[in-house]
């Protein structure tokens, strides 16, 4: 090996290592453009501190996070502005730091920075962060976020839980989102921990996750997906789920997990098999499916095993995850009374699509020029006064809310995973089930709304205890871009007093509004 080759190998190894060094709770996140080739195909991307996925942001329950986002973007085709959502955090009192562009803030302009400053008093678990401006996260601005609980009630179930036990899944495209089709027909590659192969790049490196025989690992599985859901499994190993979207759950043993865009699961893996190499599989629900040539795959490698690709084979799952089998570890009261519609406010979400745009109850979400939060702070007090017209729903304070999402062939691309900002919700009716569980359903923040073929009518409940405008949207980013969203303006009279905004937040809009369109 020449000196140049060894230097190159060192640089590549260093870059790979950077992705594993956690930052936080106080950190700079520098957003820029760079050429990357995570699956062996080189393209320009949006990177965080020079890597995609971005570095793990980590802290402890009770921490104050001060995350300074520095916008050094230069490539207009992937947008030069940005805005970052810290997915799964309630942001109580800091609605201005939630991140969705034109709902909670104006974007950060290139050449500027913005400090997201928020408290995490009572949440712990697995989260993530991503651009919430147009389809920018599909081009690379996404990464994992973990809040550790020093008093984790599941601590006795595992031996190892660290930077190296985070597993990210991402769909990767060889064409920038704005230069490709509005609705791609599948990703070119699935990246596991930032590495993968496409059918045309089957020599690319795969991620290797190392374990020591006899140890129990808490793996934190994070879907950074823009579109497909993935069926995740590890040959020869069961997975014991203990956390769902940052909610501790009763341990549930499964052998495969269908994980939808933006969902998270912690599972315990007992490294009790023969020393060797085992395939880790994440099969997308459409596009380049299967595992030929090592696509949609990574490697679980026991210490002492040869550094070779696995020869293990996949067995048909006998214990696939079924959402109705998930239950919170601690008792969590379901809002409302235990009957259909037994709430203060029940809203049905009727989906539609016209070939280019998605609609909810007849309205397609078009980002307003003035963020909804700013509209409210500026004096708008009624849903009918808030823009975009037809897409903002006023919710009273301290009320029990029920939302139903009947699956319909009128909204293609199902199953649509829906995410509610500012809350976790009880899933009282899950996809694939006709049963309503008001006793001990799982709480989470992203739910599959199922399929029309199954006759699904997924139903969730939450309580309005967090004043502010909160986005509810399909987390298939291409569908959100096509208007598949509404805003819940929660407790409008108290929004301004509950969420005092910093001057830097107020400065975002005039700076952004002065930009030429090519600099946005």
Swiss-Prot record:
SUPFAM superfamilies: Cupredoxins. Its EC number is 1.10.3.2. InterPro entries: Cu-oxidase-like_N, Cu-oxidase_2nd, Cu-oxidase_C, Cu-oxidase_fam, Cu_oxidase_CS, Cupredoxin. Cu cation 1 binds at residues 85, 419. One of its GO terms (cellular component) is extracellular region. Cu cation 2 binds at residues 87, 130, 475. Its cofactor is Cu cation. It catalyses: 4 hydroquinone + O2 = 4 benzosemiquinone + 2 H2O. PANTHER family: FI03373P-RELATED, MULTI-COPPER OXIDASE. Belongs to the multicopper oxidase family. This is Laccase. It comes from Trametes hirsuta (White-rot fungus).
């Amino acid at each position: 090996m020449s000196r140049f080759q060894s230097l190159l190998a060192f640089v590549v190894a260093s870059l790979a290592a950077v992705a594993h060094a956690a930052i936080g709770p106080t950190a700079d996140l520098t957003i820029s453009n760079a050429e990357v080739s995570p699956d062996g195909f080189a393209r320009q991307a949006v990177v965080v501190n020079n890597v995609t996925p971005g570095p793990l942001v980590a802290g402890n329950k009770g921490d104050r996070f001060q995350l300074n986002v520095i916008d050094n973007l230069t490539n207009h085709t992937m947008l030069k502005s940005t805005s970052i959502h810290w997915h799964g955090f309630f942001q109580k009192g800091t609605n201005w730091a939630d991140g969705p562009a034109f709902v909670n803030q104006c974007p950060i302009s290139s050449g500027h920075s913005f400090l997201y400053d928020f408290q995490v008093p009572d949440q712990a678990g697995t989260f993530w962060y991503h651009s919430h401006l147009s389809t920018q996260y599909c081009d690379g601005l996404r990464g994992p976020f973990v809040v550790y609980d020093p008093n984790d009630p599941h601590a006795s179930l595992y031996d190892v839980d660290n930077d190296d036990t985070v597993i990210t899944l991402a769909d990767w495209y060889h064409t920038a989102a704005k230069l490709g089709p509005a609705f791609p027909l599948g990703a070119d590659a699935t990246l596991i921990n930032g590495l993968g192969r496409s059918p045309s790049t089957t020599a690319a490196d795969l991620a290797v996750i190392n374990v020591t025989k006899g140890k129990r690992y808490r793996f934190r599985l994070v879907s950074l997906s823009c579109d497909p859901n993935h069926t995740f499994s590890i040959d020869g190993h069961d997975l014991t789920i203990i956390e769902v979207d940052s909610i501790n759950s009763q341990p549930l043993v499964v052998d495969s997990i269908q994980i939808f865009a933006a969902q998270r699961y912690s599972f315990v893996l007992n490294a009790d098999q023969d020393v060797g190499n085992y395939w880790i599989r994440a099969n997308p629900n459409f596009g380049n499916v299967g595992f030929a040539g090592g696509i949609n795959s990574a490697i679980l490698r026991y210490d002492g095993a040869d550094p070779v690709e696995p020869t293990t084979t996949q067995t048909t799952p006998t214990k696939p995850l079924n959402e109705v089998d998930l239950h919170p570890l601690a008792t969590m009261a379901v809002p409302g009374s235990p009957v259909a519609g037994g709430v203060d406010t029940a809203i049905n979400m009727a989906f539609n699509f016209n070939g280019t745009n998605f609609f909810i109850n007849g309205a397609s979400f078009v980002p307003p020029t003035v963020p909804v939060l700013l509209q409210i702070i500026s004096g708008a007090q009624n849903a009918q006064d808030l823009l975009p017209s037809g897409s903002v729903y006023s919710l009273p304070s301290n009320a029990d809310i029920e939302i139903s999402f009947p699956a319909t062939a009128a909204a293609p691309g199902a199953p649509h995973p829906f995410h509610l900002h500012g809350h976790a919700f009880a899933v009282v009716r899950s996809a694939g089930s006709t049963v309503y569980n008001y006793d001990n359903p799982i709480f989470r923040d992203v739910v599959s709304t199922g399929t029309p073929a199954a006759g699904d009518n997924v139903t969730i409940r939450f309580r309005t205890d967090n004043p502010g405008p909160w986005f509810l949207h399909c987390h298939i980013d291409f569908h959100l871009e096509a208007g598949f969203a509404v805003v819940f303006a929660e407790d409008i009279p108290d929004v301004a007093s509950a969420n005092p905004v910093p001057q830097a937040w107020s400065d975002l809009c005039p700076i952004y509004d002065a930009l030429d369109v090519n600099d946005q």
